[in-house]
Amino acid sequence: LIIAITAGARAEDDGFTHGISLLHELKYSADFKHFDYVNPDAPKGGTFVGYALHDVRHFGSHWSTAIDTAAGWERTYDRLIIRSADELAGYYGSLAEGIHLSENHRTLTFRLHASAHFHDGEPITSQDVKFSFDQALATVDGMLFLDWIKSVEIIDELHISINLKNRLTNSNLLLLSYEPRILPYHYWKDRGDTTAITLEPPLGSGPYRFADFDKGYVRYERVEDYWGASLPVNRGRYNFDAIRYEVYRDATVTREAVRKGLLDFYIEPDIGHWVRSYDTPAHQQGLLRKEELYMRDNAGPAQAIVFNSRRPLFSDIRVREALALAYDFEWQNRAFWYGARKRAMSYFAGSSFAASGLPGPAELELLQPFRNQVPPRVFTEPYELPATDGFGRNRHALSRAQQLLTTAGWQLKDGHLVDKAGRRFEFEFLLPAPDQQRIVLPYIDGLRKLGITASIRLVESAQWVNLMQTFEYDAFIQGHGTTQPPIMMLPFFFHSNAAIKPLTFNKAGISDPVVDALIERAQQAVSLQDIITSCQVLDRVLLWQFYHIPLQQEEPARLIYWAKFGRPQQEHLAAHQPIIDFVDLWWSDDAMTARVDAALNVR
């Protein structure tokens, strides 16, 4: 186990260090000046115009609210630590000047920068940090995501300790690199609930502050005297003087806005439009650019069809397998996606955490205690889903599906699949967006060949949230990619505790003691190899129970952007970060911007 002290790093006399890693040596020493993937001399200036998918309706906390916080809000706050984007699990102090982990790994203490202050000039102290944790832990989301915290203790004005229920894990560090954002106690103490819906932009401390907004846009301005601007973790980042998000709820309208130059940047989710919608004169002149970015931070299925196993209809593993066999991925890939998509055959597809082939010796050792509790095929067969020729000829898979349904007690009668009581096999796909219908409709046609009747119900966002929280659905399409390493998200996607809590990702209702044990094993692993083995075994156990139908593997981010920006030479190193964070590495190039503006004005 390697904790913080690495080649070139030095601990201070009191044991505090500049960074921490539980899985590998830190790349950057205590005297590092900036991350390798930035341009430390990037000029400041200009405006970046991005897009948002929802109206500006809320500026407060995102904990336990059904309304999305305004796009870009996270840049107005500071975090205790941040994750280096060119390391798997390297974390460095941001608001925290120093980090100390106790010998038993159950107390994590932070020393705050004495110079840190909020945008109103008030210093950031331990009281603000404790207040932020207390507020988060009082919410439903916080109780779930932060349940590993035993207590938060103020030592003095600049020192605060987080006492843990168990040993510190990489999952804990990864979460701390995102949450909680540090809130000002002096601002909130007389304002009440930090989670209340509000259109009053709150006080922050980050590199940007709220400037102005309306229902259809929000604009942020760079804080000239941002206290953390010269920190090594921030040099070369946050270069735009202003960042503006325009709200576009319809993808067709968004694409048109990009082509007209109303937006600087768009992540194209549809491979068909990527191929055919941007062959414009501006693209041919090199002004409107297309680029695929391959990220290592996400893996697994980008999407999966989820069946609610809490419902009797989907509680039988044979039924779930039959439903998986009826899905013809290859036909959809050919017909809709130009054959560009790769099917996910693992919950961690595209990473070293994915199971492949038959289990090896280390996996077998971990599996052995559960031999009588998992499907026998976990030991004897590599997991595969049937592949077709892409032209709708999946007769063999449907025949196998029919056999499984028969053994599960279903039979065909007058073209309908019925149980012993004569009840038809009928269920509903709940969809929040019309564009998902083209995934579901061909699948419904395949199910009809088995005598199964499936329908679609489109719902608006508020109703969708309510139905998700109350588990009132049969099936739907869920985003299912996981960060790397995936251990932070495992409890929320797969643990039985999450199956009964409304604000989690365990929408399939997975409740399996073997799965729980494997998740806990992965989280307590003390080496990267132990995490890999635990995840591979977990992968096999989950796959062979058919809770989901994995769809396409996580794909490269397909960027459409105007050639107005400078970019770091080593930007490609930053593969362990959310795709939208690349914007924080770019800068406005005056000459390039003038060229684009001139071309747009001519049009």
Where are these regions (language model features)?
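Detector for C-terminal structural segments
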Residues: D14, A52-H54, I67-A71, D214-V218, ...
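Surface-exposed binding/hinge segments that line
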Residues: R111, L144-D190, S205-D214, G357-Q373
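Extracellular/periplasmic solute-recognition and catalytic clefts
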Residues: S151-I154, A211-E221, E246-R311, R318-A322, ...
